[in-house]
């Protein structure tokens, strides 16, 4: 009788529209209940029975109930699920399988089955890729997933690498394909095989993509030729190899091994500038005046060279610092090293005075055993030989940026606009509280940015520098020439790593068009989007593998008195993040470890400080001693405690 009653339908509609609702993101806790976070200020309690309908991270719309002045949320509609494709560990046997997502806040096993055509008998402990197929808020009875890919077995020593690559959907091995012969590009190659070119790399490097030759000129000036490996002499634009490189965009460097952008035959052999092998190169000849200025007679040309020596960073640095046993194999090579050190000195001074020089941070290298076990982690400081190569590459990239800008008006540029204009006033106000006066408009110009950076570098600590980092914009890849505030340069376009960066291959093709006097096509903006996304994923993958290896390495230090010096890198409401100085591991110090009485403790991300009883006890960039309290292998997190 009430079936089609329009009044009843209207009443229902009215009740529905009058019931308060909120949209937000579900935050799970370890205690079964959760919260619907609407924004930074507002959240609603989700009781345990209602949490069974949702998952941490789901974006939902919920009905808000008020009882006895307590509000709670009842999930009603799924806006965007947190999990779609994910990796996890399989539980159970073939007929009754479940998968536990590999995520710190997702503990529940999700029932699942293997997808059709996936020929693997899954067993307890296997790692797999899965895709969500059912969700309670979509009208399904429960969560359900489908296993779409087997990754590896639970006890595989190389789980950190295979799981991380599968999680981010990145390639596990080098691309297939061979390049049998060089293309006829219509380029005249200058024969420079008689010159004493050298490469300087790590001892284990196989993909050498830059060689250097220096010459003293009569008037105190120096000439530098930077010769770069020439993969575009083998790989035609639009070919199968080119398309594969375009998708990968970069060689993926993970602790212990890399997954190259090009087939290894090219990256480690045919294109690699090996000692005593004749190789085609794209080269840049530049003249440096006595103060390190790059003069206007920049020349790009195609050539063939034969590297005369594969030098190693540490050996070259030792020799220049008059330590160690290593000697250059001939006076000619020794002379090259001396001249390159002079160039480095001049360019370093020029950049210090006219641009910006990054503070030296050590690189951390994992030393791994046969089974992927971490034998040691060593900090490798950036020494004179590293700086020789760095200064030569930066100079060469400045040259390419100028030539592409002036001759074509486009290229693949690294652009960094400094501070976000929306933040300029807040930035000026913050600096003022620390006694630095800047003009909010001037600081948005390249000169103003450089001036501020030099003032910050002159501060006794890096504290203020760390406070303003959040006001900076991100570096971008652009086809349009633009400034790079971070380097303090008007334009910057890389072409010195074409074996491992697709953008550098594009710039090679554009520079070759300039050399031949041909017209060139502007690269499509989509390629910069792909490159930026791949760069992001590769960085996350490197961090994920690193976290896993750090957890393995420090596991036996948990609960011991072993002390580590640690730099505070971030402060949040829940505690502090620190970086261990000796090995680069990131650890978390929970707030209760800082001070037992919560009411007397203020952890401020805004100010970058921890106050105890109103006094600043810790601030970002402080270095403190810590011990390792706990290592949680399932979440790869390291919990530290300050030494009292």
Swiss-Prot record:
PROSITE patterns membership: RIBONUCLEASE_II
Gene Ontology cellular component annotations, sorted alphabetically: cytosol
SUPFAM superfamilies according to UniProt: Nucleic acid-binding proteins
Protein encoded by which gene: rnb
EC number assigned by the record: 3.1.13.1
PANTHER family from the UniProt entry: EXORIBONUCLEASE 2 (PTHR23355:SF37), RIBONUCLEASE (PTHR23355)
Catalytic reaction(s) noted: Exonucleolytic cleavage in the 3'- to 5'-direction to yield nucleoside 5'-phosphates
HAMAP family: RNase_II
Domain RNB span(s) in chain numbering: 189-516
InterPro entries: CSD, NA-bd_OB-fold, RNase_B_OB_dom, RNase_II, RNase_II/R, RNase_II/R_CS, RNase_II/RNase_R, RNR_Ribonuclease
S1 motif domain boundaries: 561-643
Name recorded for this polypeptide: Exoribonuclease 2
One Pfam family hit: OB_RNB
Source species of the chain: Escherichia coli O127:H6 (strain E2348/69 / EPEC)
Compartments where located: Cytoplasm
Key word GTP-binding present: no
Family label: Belongs to the RNR ribonuclease family. RNase II subfamily.
Function: Involved in mRNA degradation. Hydrolyzes single-stranded polyribonucleotides processively in the 3' to 5' direction.
Record keywords, A-Z: Cytoplasm, Exonuclease, Hydrolase, Nuclease, RNA-binding
């Amino acid at each position: 009788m009430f079936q089609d009653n329009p009044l009843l339908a209207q009443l229902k509609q009215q009740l529905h529209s009058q019931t308060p609702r909120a949209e937000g993101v579900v935050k799970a806790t370890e205690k079964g209940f959760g919260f619907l976070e609407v924004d930074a200020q507002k959240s609603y309690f989700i009781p345990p029975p209602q949490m069974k309908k949702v998952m941490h991270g789901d974006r939902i719309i919920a009905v808000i109930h008020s009882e006895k002045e307590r509000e709670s949320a009842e999930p009603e509609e799924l806006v965007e699920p947190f999990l779609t494709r994910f990796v996890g560990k399989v539980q159970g046997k073939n007929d009754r399988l479940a998968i536990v997502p590999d995520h710190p806040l997702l503990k529940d096993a999700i029932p699942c089955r293997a997808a059709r055509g996936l020929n693997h008998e899954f067993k307890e402990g296997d790692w797999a890729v899965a895709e969500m197929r059912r969700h309670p808020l979509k009208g399904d009875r429960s969560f359900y997933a489908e296993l779409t890919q087997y990754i590896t077995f639970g006890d595989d020593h190389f789980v950190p690498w295979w799981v991380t690559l599968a999680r981010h959907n990145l390639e596990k091995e080098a691309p297939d394909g061979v390049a049998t012969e060089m293309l006829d590009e219509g380029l005249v190659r200058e024969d420079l095989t008689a010159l004493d070119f050298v490469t300087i790399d790590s001892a284990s490097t196989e993909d050498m993509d830059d060689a250097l030759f220096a010459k003293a000129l009569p008037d105190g000036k120096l000439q530098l030729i930077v010769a770069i490996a020439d993969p575009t002499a083998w790989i035609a634009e639009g070919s199968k190899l080119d398309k594969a490189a375009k998708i990968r965009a970069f060689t993926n460097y993970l602790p212990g091994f890399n997954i190259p952008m090009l087939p290894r035959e090219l990256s480690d052999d045919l294109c690699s500038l090996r000692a005593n092998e004749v190789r085609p190169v794209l080269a840049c000849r530049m003249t440096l005046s006595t103060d390190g200025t790059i003069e206007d007679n920049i020349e790009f040309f195609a050539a063939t060279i034969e590297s005369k020596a594969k030098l190693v960073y540490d050996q070259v640095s030792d020799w220049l610092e008059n330590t160690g046993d290593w000697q250059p194999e001939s006076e000619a090579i020794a002379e090259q090293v001396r001249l390159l050190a002079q160039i480095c000195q001049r360019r370093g001074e020029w950049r210090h005075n006219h641009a910006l020089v990054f503070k030296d941070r050590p690189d951390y290298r994992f030393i791994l055993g046969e089974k992927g076990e971490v034998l040691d982690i060593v900090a490798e400081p950036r020494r004179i030989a590293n700086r020789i190569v760095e200064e030569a590459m930066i100079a060469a990239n400045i040259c390419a940026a100028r030539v592409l800008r002036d001759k074509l008006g486009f290229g693949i540029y690294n652009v960094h606009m400094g501070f976000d204009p929306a933040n300029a006033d807040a930035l000026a106000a913050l600096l003022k509280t620390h006694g630095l006066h800047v003009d909010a408009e001037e600081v948005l110009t390249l000169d103003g940015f450089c001036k501020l950076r030099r003032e910050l570098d002159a501060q006794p600590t890096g504290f203020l520098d760390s406070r303003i980092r959040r006001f900076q914009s991100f570096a971008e890849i652009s086809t349009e020439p633009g400034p790079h505030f971070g380097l303090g340069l008007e334009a910057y376009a890389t072409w010195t790593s074409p074996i491992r960066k697709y953008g550098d291959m594009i710039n090679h093709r554009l520079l070759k068009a300039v050399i031949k006097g041909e017209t060139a096509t502007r690269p499509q903006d989509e390629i910069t989007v792909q490159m930026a996304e791949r760069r992001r994923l590769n960085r996350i993958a490197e961090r994920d593998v690193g976290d896993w290896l750090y957890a393995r390495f420090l596991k036996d230090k948990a609960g011991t008195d072993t002390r580590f010096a640690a730099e505070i890198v971030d402060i949040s409401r829940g505690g502090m993040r620190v970086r261990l100085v000796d090995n680069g591991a990131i650890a978390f110090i929970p707030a209760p470890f800082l001070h037992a009485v919560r009411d007397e403790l203020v952890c401020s991300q805004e100010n970058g400080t921890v106050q105890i009883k109103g006094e600043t006890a810790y601030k970002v960039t402080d270095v403190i001693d810590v011990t390792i309290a706990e290592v949680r292998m399932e979440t790869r997190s390291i919990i530290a405690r300050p030494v009292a």
